[in-house]
Amino acid sequence: MSSGLIKTKTIVGIDYSLNSPAVCISTNGGTAFSDCYFYYLTSKKKHIGKMLENVIGYEHKEWKSPIERFTNLSGWVLHILDTLHKKQKNKHVFIEGYSYGSKGQAVFQIAENGGILKYRLQKRFTCKTIVPSVVKKLATGKGNADKQKM
């Protein structure tokens, strides 16, 4: 038998976007709502602050260039992992993959934003990308669930 130490997994789920990114952290490996902490960025003043004990909204920082915007967004994620949850070790990071529904210039900005986050994360954490249909299937039972069902 081992020394009795149990290595608890810290599971990190990231739904990364330009306008409303969110991070969910389960500090004990559980999947119940009460086992998790939820963080999100918003531009709406009424959604900033502690909504529930484990749900906290942060305001987007001002930015002057796309790179500054992407750096702010990825920095916010790293702040959550490194500062708010620094005690939790053994972090397993999962990022929802691209949905491919965007068009035009947004496609490039979404890709650049995601690339910067993944680059910064992979320097310190093991990251895995999960395709949106798998996330939807786990959450609703249907891989093609719409936003309302999610």
Where is each model-derived feature located?
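Phosphate- and other anionic-substrate recognition elements at nucleic-acid/protein interfaces
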Residues: 2-150
